[in-house]
Amino acid sequence: MDFLKLEHIHHSYYSSTQAKEVLRDINLDIREGEFVSFIGPSGCGKTTLLSIIAGLFPATEGKVFIDGEIIAPHNQSLIGYMLQQDYLFPWKTIEDNVTIGLKIMQRDNKTHKVTANALLQEVGLPHVGSYYPRELSGGMRQRVALARTLAVNPKILLLDEPFSALDYQSKLKLEDLVVETLKAYQKTAILVTHDIGEAIAMSERVFLFSANPGTLHKVFEIPSALQQLSPFDVRQHPVYSEVFQTIWKELESLG
């Protein structure tokens, strides 16, 4: 079942002297519970498209449907956003950071502590609720950011290069955690990344965009043999290098 549907998305940025077209006629469908990645050269509009899906601003033309409804303020709570920066409030405890979305949405505060503790346990940080962000490493803070995103129980997660600021070891561990957690919670997810290997390791499909303006160039289905593995193990599988080379050559052909 298609959970997210984009129809004829066009977007341009306007200044006093010119208009710059950044997205042209984007049409795509993402199934409920599916994990996909958006990749492409700089200028292909990946982050702009993610922002339109999130409802941060409307497309110049076209429609975004989530769960059969056009994206609007009343259903934006279905969407969770995780960015490269964790954006934790430094003056709040980790527990308070995890539950900040629940408080903003005025959910029952009697369950906030239970929710925070359960999610911190889920992301491998069971004893840090009373800590402050400055006391945690970058990888740990991104785990907290994941817990905070999940706290409001979104149906779809938008991940905008959330691992790019981490060291390689932390990145690999967090990739595994994100995929495992989102599968357990049966969440739909879109990852924006420049890293082809990351896209292959985490996704069921990879959407390749061309630039200037951004258009959907090609969609790659990741082999089922890789989809069953953790991101770390995907990179060890002999099929991985074949898929990588295929996508790399297609990306190179875009110039």
Where in this protein do the model-derived segments appear?
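The feature captures the beta-strand-to-loop junction immediately N-terminal to the Walker
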Residues: 39-41
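Helix-to-loop junction immediately C-terminal to a conserved catalytic motif
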Residues: 54
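Conserved ABC transporter NBD signature motif
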Residues: 62-74
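Short helical segment in ABC ATPase nucleotide-binding domains corresponding to the A-loop/adjacent helical element
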Residues: 95-103, 113, 221
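Conserved signature/switch motifs of ABC ATPase nucleotide-binding domains
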Residues: 131-134, 152
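Hydrophobic anchor residue at the start of the ABC signature
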Residues: 146
